[in-house]
């Protein structure tokens, strides 16, 4: 990736922060894309801005897309965020087709910037079971990108890099430390308190806390 323009889908979470750090380490010219989808945890947008500045992104685009108009998720509708542990079923925090929507927008930006590399922080090990985080989805989207774009029609091969896909949350926390990324810049909680703290009980908080504990690292997160 050295010297290449790379589009990093930057939510502001720990995973996307590590992806941005990896792109910086590779010497890429980073264009960060953050989607403001009117999510419950909009505080992550502030984290995304801090991370983009920290990695020296050439551009940081914040794109508004009001998915509350769709609803259907605890992150985009008046549905309680579950706090009873990480289960085996797909939870109500799943946002319908979110990564498909976000990657489609990222692909459009990549083609507009004449970039063929996209980085996304999906994870298929320590995660909430979302179907759009699985390897088959990423592989399928690469094929779609070749069929759906002018550049693809002209032989450009888009690469969807998911460097964290087979890492545990402990691996990801350790990678953040190796990269010199301050994890306190990132935001994971789905249901922040009015005081601006991580709730400590939603799936995302539980996975984050467990990751730091399993890695034997101090967790800089402020929990309620």
From Swiss-Prot:
An MF annotation (GO) of this entry: zinc ion binding
Needed co-factor(s): Zn(2+)
Signal sequence segment: none
Textual note on the cofactor: Binds 1 zinc ion per subunit.
Catalytically driven reaction(s): 7-carboxy-7-deazaguanine + NH4(+) + ATP = 7-cyano-7-deazaguanine + ADP + phosphate + H2O + H(+)
InterPro entries xrefs: QueC (IPR018317), Rossmann-like_a/b/a_fold (IPR014729)
Keyword line: ATP-binding, Ligase, Metal-binding, Nucleotide-binding, Queuosine biosynthesis, Zinc
Protein name in UniProt: 7-cyano-7-deazaguanine synthase 1
Top-level taxonomy: Bacteria, Pseudomonadati, Pseudomonadota, Alphaproteobacteria, Sphingomonadales
């Amino acid at each position: 990736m050295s010297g290449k323009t790379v589009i990093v889908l930057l939510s502001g979470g720990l995973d996307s922060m590590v992806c941005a750090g990896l792109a910086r380490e590779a010497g890429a010219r980073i264009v960060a894309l953050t989607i403001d989808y009117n999510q419950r945890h909009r505080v992550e947008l502030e984290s995304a801005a801090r991370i983009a500045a920290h990695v020296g992104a050439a551009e940081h685009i914040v794109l508004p897309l009001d998915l509350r108009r769709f609803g259907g998720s605890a992150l985009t509708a008046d549905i309680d965020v579950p706090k009873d542990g990480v289960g085996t079923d797909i939870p109500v925090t799943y946002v319908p087709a979110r990564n498909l929507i976000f990657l489609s927008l990222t692909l459009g930006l990549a083609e507009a910037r004449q970039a063929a590399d996209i980085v996304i922080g999906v994870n298929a090990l320590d995660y909430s079971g979302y179907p759009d985080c699985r390897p088959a989805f990423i592989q399928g989207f690469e094929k779609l990108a070749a069929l759906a774009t002018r550049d693809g029609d002209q032989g450009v091969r888009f690469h969807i890099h998911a460097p964290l896909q087979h890492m545990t949350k402990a691996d990801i926390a350790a990678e953040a430390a190796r990269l010199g990324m301050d994890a306190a810049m990132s935001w994971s909680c789905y249901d922040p308190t009015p005081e601006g703290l991580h709730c400590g009980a939603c799936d995302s908080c539980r996975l984050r806390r467990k990751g730091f504990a399993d890695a034997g690292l101090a967790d800089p997160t402020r929990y309620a």
